[in-house]
């Protein structure tokens, strides 16, 4: 049976919550034989994640594939799932997250329609929901006023994204061939590589479809979660690493043909640089500001126009104000935005 979609689930010591993730996919899709789940055990050694992965494959050998690798980090686990995917489409679901049953059925039905009609769609965008455990609230992210709904379209047909709207990994289902053609070079043992995943392949995407359904449920609230403010601050060097990879992927103004895609990618990269600026200021590392200065210097040398846009645009100016007062204003602005948008 040809597989319509592969859901990749990277797992690292995920025994406490991975079953919910797998169940949400299998139950949501009705255990359909054209749906595949690839569970990647990323060298888990502190719990029974490897055994759970193998048990899922034993129970559903035609639907679930368990893959084991030495610990390499989230990015390598995602790409291991891509390498083992049999589906025409691929979607990553982190092991502490889950999918909505009705929405994931709609996604699979939509993908089947493309394959049956022979219509080549490179990327499907769907909505996602931040599930905040601390106050049992939800923050819904959709693209209704940005992307045409219910039709195949190209980058030039999309509108202007708000600061709260970005095509993150949670929103994306790639055609597997496109994702493999991107040849993503994910750094080992590095967090926040989902930004690379949701950036580097985009110029290879020629056709898109927006499914207005809340497919992905993104859990927020674990103390060790990578988007937790304290954790992110302690791992700011990971963001520096990711920013450099994104920087060197393209000379955005020269390499990206579509004006709309060029604008989107430059805005997204600017946000990544802003995150580096904000959390470098929050970091207790004695070299944090020197490292940030080095990052900005690298960008200026690589592409002066990208540097000017990222550093001297509104977002760049607001997140790089000089002196103690500038730092206070920057961090105060971040915390206000965090309360309003609730992105971590």
Listing of model-derived features with the role each one plays in the protein:
Residues 69-85:
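Glycine-rich, basic loop-to-helix element that forms the pyrophosphate-binding segment
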Residues 74, 98-208, 218-232:
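Donor-binding/catalytic cores of nucleotide-activated saccharide
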Residues 90:
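Short aromatic/hydrophobic "clamp" motif used to bind/position activated sugar donors
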Residues 14-28:
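Short, well-formed alpha-helical segments that are part of the catalytic scaffolds
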Residues 213-222, 228-257, 275, 281-304:
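Catalytic core of nucleotide-sugar-dependent glycosyltransferases
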Residues 41-51:
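A conserved acidic beta->alpha catalytic loop
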Residues 4-6, 36, 196:
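Cell-envelope/extracellular polymer assembly enzymes that use nucleotide-activated donors
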Residues 282-344:
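Membrane-interface aromatic/basic loop that binds lipid-linked glycans or pyrophosphate carriers
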């Amino acid at each position: 049976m040809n597989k319509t979609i592969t859901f990749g689930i990277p797992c690292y010591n995920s025994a406490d919550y991975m079953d919910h993730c797998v169940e949400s996919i299998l139950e949501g899709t009705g255990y359909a034989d054209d749906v595949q789940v690839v569970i990647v055990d990323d060298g888990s050694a502190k719990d029974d994640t490897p055994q759970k992965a193998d048990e899922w494959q034993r129970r559903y050998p035609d639907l679930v594939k368990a893959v084991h690798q030495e610990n390499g980090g989230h990015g390598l686990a995602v790409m291991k799932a891509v390498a083992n995917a049999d589906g025409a489409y691929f979607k990553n679901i982190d092991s502490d997250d889950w999918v909505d049953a009705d929405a994931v059925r709609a996604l699979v039905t939509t993908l089947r329609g493309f394959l049956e009609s022979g219509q080549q769609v490179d990327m499907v965008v769907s909505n996602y929901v931040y599930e905040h455990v601390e106050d049992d609230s939800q923050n819904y992210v959709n693209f209704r006023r940005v992307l045409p709904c219910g039709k195949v379209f190209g980058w030039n047909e999309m509108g202007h994204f708000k600061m709260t709207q970005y095509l993150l990994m949670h929103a994306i289902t790639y055609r597997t061939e496109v994702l493999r053609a991107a040849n993503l070079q994910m750094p080992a043992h590095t967090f926040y590589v989902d930004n690379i995943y949701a950036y580097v392949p985009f110029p290879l995407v020629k056709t898109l479809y927006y499914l207005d359904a809340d497919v992905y449920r993104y859990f927020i609230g674990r103390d060790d979660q990578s988007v937790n403010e304290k954790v992110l601050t302690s791992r700011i060097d990971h963001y520096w690493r990711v920013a450099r990879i994104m920087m060197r992927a393209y000379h955005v103004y020269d390499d990206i043909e579509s004006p709309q895609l060029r604008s989107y990618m430059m805005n997204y990269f600017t946000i990544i640089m802003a995150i580096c600026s904000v959390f470098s200021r929050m970091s207790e590392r004695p070299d944090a500001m020197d490292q940030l200065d080095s990052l900005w210097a690298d960008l200026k040398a690589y592409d002066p126009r990208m540097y000017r846009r990222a550093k001297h645009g509104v977002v760049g100016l607001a997140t790089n104000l000089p002196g103690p007062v500038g730092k206070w204003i920057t961090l105060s602005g971040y915390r206000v935005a965090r309360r309003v948008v609730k992105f971590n």
